[in-house]
Amino acid sequence: MAMGAVLSSRTFASPLSSSGKQHPPQNNKCTCSSPPTRDKFSRLTTRTTIFQVSNYSRSTSMERFQLSARFHQPVVDSSTNYLTRWFYNANLKRRRIECFLTSDPINTGWLKPRRWDNFTSLDTACVQPDYKIPVRTRADCKAEQYEITGSPLSPSDVPAEAVLIGDTNEISPWWQQFPKRWTVVLLCFFSFLLCNMDRVNMSIAILPMSSEFGWSPATVGLIQSSFFWGYLLTQILGGIWADRFGGKVVLGFGVVWWSIATVLTPLAAKIGLPFLLVMRAFMGIGEGVAMPAMNNILSKWVPVSERSRSLALVYSGMYLGSVTGLAFSPLLISRFGWPSVFYAFGSLGSVWFALWQRKAHSSPSEDPELSKAEKRYILGGSTLKEPVTSIPWKLILSKPPVWALIVSHFCHNWGTFILLTWMPTYYNQVLKFNLTESGLLCVLPWLTMAIFANIGGWIADTLVGRGVSITNVRKIMQSIGFLGPALFLTLLSKVRTPAMAVLCMACSQGSDAFSQSGLYSNHQDIGPRYAGVLLGLSNTAGVLAGVFGTAATGYILQKGSWDSVFQVAVVLYIVGTVVWNVFSTGEKVLE
């Protein structure tokens, strides 16, 4: 930029002059620029374009060279008809220059240059320049990494025609430069935030609803479980639909479906219990497609070097959705009544869907606004394959890594669902906390999981970036996700103070969140084309573990103690660790 200021036909106050004296304008005379030559300096000066004085840009070309050169003012000698060069001595040492251009009207002017490609001969190169609106320009240059020595230019040294060095392209706003792949990731994050907000609001609203309609505890349990009827139904179907029709269509359908079911829940409850059960099952149908569809779309948009942290961010949306739902539901119910929580949370889905339709695409090849550079980075030299038309079930179920996913997901969710479902009861019966304290402490594991899921994601991607194999990274992260909870649940039966018990529970859930960079990321590793189906298969096993584990815990507590509950979970965590480390892989096994 500093070189551009020196070569410009405008008059400048030299940045090297302590007085900041303004040079008077040059008289109009027949001058021209020398034709382009093949030396380095000419290549810099002949490929640039004119821009307005108010623009600011920085020339980074100078940062790549240590130059020792002479600046020249070419003129035409009419008697000999050849170009003569007057040189300005400058010694440049390696530093960076930041230039800030300002202008104000005054009685001086600048001359419009002529492009070299318009000149047909040296005779036509000598032209009378056009006089433009008078301006005076000052260049304030701050040298930071380049040391420049030399005497300031005199008025006669400034060429009447010059070519400005620098990139004149306007810089796009930051929101246009934000990577499109992370726009998709953030939209998936907010969809999962809404998913758990709409799911947990019933756990709070069920209390005033049961009082109003006179429901028994058995009826309350039936209502709570009806959600899983639809949720189990669409796990595998959601994966098939996503792999065949694209993640954008399926995830958008899911959010709209469960949002409508959420808004209609108060009406169904007032009509009758059967209608409420059907509406809760419908809501489960919508939420059941969310995870397979998300997994499908991110398998196409996120490169392997960013896979762990992107999935960790999306799944942390579920945890933060639970925190948000548990925090705001009591406030809405106390001020506006229990129906308000369903209306408020359900209506947010329409806002998300509008953004989703405008910004998201099922794959990079379908996005017309995606830059070529980002597309190359996402694909990593490979090409996107056509959508799946048929599912090779026999091939999928014959792969040991697929069964490692299914078994590990079952073992993982058994312990996770037990802790999240029975935690308030444990706080109340064992630690003797009241219900209010128990409710507040229930938020702590969700916050811990949200934080540590993202920490684990960054650690996993860092290891991949440093050359650790994907297989080893997945095994390391999932081993932490299994053995961490096993350790802290074992310690939980030994502690005697409530504070230590709460700390053990929080640490158990925090280490559990490392699974987002383990088995939850592995579906895209072993079969990116079938990522939706693979997640549907393993998550079906995970949901079944939650259903059976929750029921089995109640049976164990009737016959035994909490120590027995934790021991069963610890055993399954160890089994999952062994299966995962023996049979899992980070390599692609399904084409």
UniProtKB/Swiss-Prot annotation:
Q: List, alphabetically, the Gene3D superfamilies matched.
A: MFS general substrate transporter like domains
- Biased amino acid composition, Polar residues: 8-36
Protein function: Probable anion transporter.
Q: Where in the cell is it found?
A: Plastid, Chloroplast membrane
Put simply, this protein is called Probable anion transporter 4, chloroplastic
What InterPro entries does UniProt report for this protein, alphabetically?
A: MFS, MFS_dom, MFS_Na/Anion_cotransporter, MFS_trans_sf, SLC17A9-like
Transit peptide start-stop: 1-76
- Give the main localization category: plastid
What family does this belong to?
Belongs to the major facilitator superfamily. Sodium/anion cotransporter (TC 2.A.1.14) family.
Q: Which PROSITE patterns match?
A: MFS
Spell out the residue ranges making up region: Disordered: 1-38
Q: What topology does the record note for this protein and the membrane?
A: Multi-pass membrane protein
Record carries keyword Ion transport: yes
One GO cellular component this record assigns the protein to is:
chloroplast inner membrane
Q: Which GO terms describe its biological process?
A: monoatomic ion transport; xanthophyll cycle
Q: Supply the alphabetized keyword list.
A: Chloroplast, Ion transport, Membrane, Plastid, Transit peptide, Transmembrane, Transmembrane helix, Transport
